[in-house]
Amino acid sequence: MARTARRRLRGVRADGLMPNARRLRPYLFIIAMCLALSPAWSVPAQPLVPTQPDLPPLGRSRFDQLIGNAPVPFPYARLARTIEAQMQPDPGGLPALKTTLIPLGRSLQKNAGAPDFFRFPRVVAAADGLNKAGVEPLQDRLFLGFHEKGEVIEVISYNDAAARFEFQIVRDYAPGKTPQVFYARRSLCLACHQNAAPIFARPLWDETSANPAIARRLRDARKDFYGIKLSGTDIAYFIDAATERANLFSVWQTLWQQGCGAGESGDRCRMEAFSAALDYARNGRLPAADALPTLARNWKIRWPHGLPIPNPDLPNRDPLAALPDAANDPLLPRPPLAIWRAPDKTAFIVGLAGMLDTAAVKQSAVKQLGQRDLSAALERLRARGELAARPFNPSLLHAVLAEFGMPHRPSLARLPPARIEADVRFTGAHTLFRTQCGLCHDSTANFPPNFLHGDDAAVSARLDHCAERIFYRLSLWHVTAARRSKSPMPPSSILATRGIDVETWARSPALAALLEDVRLRIRAQGGQPEILLARPFEQLRACLPNPAAP
């Protein structure tokens, strides 16, 4: 019941789109705190997102649209001000860009600050403010992870045209350098971001500065962190809530495109859903129980066993605890928050309303549309094919306004070509390693350790140096899950994108060959691979570049 309440409440914005919603925030916080102590549901892992191209198939990311053709603002405080300027001030006095510090986290940059972790924490930020008039919405659509010592910003931002979050990385983000923006290797990101969306820890957010012990060490290490105030659980809560809402975008898009179906009946279903979303946004009215009959009929056919609701929650982790818990690994498959056995029409309609241009909704509802009947305008949109089975887009609202003589004139930024970093090479003397591990470990980045990057001689030397840790992680496929101190490599999510189930992989000749290769490397250096699993992983020889680990 607690999870149901959490899903229904936290999936709705506490802003102008939901009357009296701010009164719910104290109750939402109590629910979240209770959930931190609740056991995980014993349900199967949520379905993994199919393999997707790194570059957007359509459109561009919200981050690209925000930056345009200009360099990424530097330093970070300037970038934060640029983002803040797109959003309305928070009525409660908090920044619209909610930001916290994580010195000992679980991201790819977890070792970038070593040995000065508290002097160089990771900055995690979520856009949580309503957009200003004429500005594309950023709320729940833009998330940042900045690391000063790593000279990098990891960006997750929404692409309305493709109905997906894009993963990007800003490299060379440092004084005297020109920041370079790339679309990241999507499969690498999805190993942890299993819903292709942002993730965050469950309460009590002990990795963040909300933990008094963490905050105390941060204050001792440094006086100023890019103008960011050390915050309590309030900021962490808002970031958590933003990731919850963002992960529901895929649910609303699925119901919009697939739930309603194709053809005229599907178009009319979407017209009814859009009309209900506008009615909720303008007047706060919820849909009737018998609304969307086409969705109800299609549900039984498309999802006879229910629709899994994505889970963005990592287990809460105290990095200062004496004993690490393997269950906190973000690579482990996560169960869905819930399985919907029937369509939650109220949540669907409220979710669609939450994806609209908030400033345009308020302006049209109060000053222009008033209580006008929108049915004729929506019918014209349907006749033109604008309600076909394609991604739900805030531009639909602008199309409705245009029907009433209020055209939307967006400022179209000239964007540089979208680009990715160099491709992985699956040839050479280490073909097996490159094939099985190159997606994550053959890159110019230091994290995760790029022991497969370079010519054959360099790769061989790096494999020698990393052999102990590679052997340890590969060997965990032959250890029962309950006895593992780390997640095995390659991650199960990466295997799944290649159509390999974990049981098949554990018995595969490929895994045996990888193990034999590193076993021989360890012995050639005078080591004993047979005893490595009895040692704590952190005591094994550090992988390259020091002190990172695979």
Q: Residue ranges of each PLM-predicted region?
A:
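N-terminal accessory alpha/beta regions
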Residues: 91-119, 131-135
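Mixed-charge (acidic/basic) macromolecular-recognition segments
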Residues: 188-258
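Signal peptide processing junction and immediate N-terminal pro/mature segment
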Residues: 40-46
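Bacterial N-terminal signal peptides
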Residues: 27-39
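Bacterial N-terminal signal peptides that target proteins for export
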Residues: 9-12, 20-29
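Acidic/His-rich structured neighborhood in mature extracellular/periplasmic domains
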Residues: 118-219
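Aromatic- and Gly/Pro-enriched helix-to-coil junctions and flexible linker segments
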Residues: 46-89, 99-105, 230, 234-550
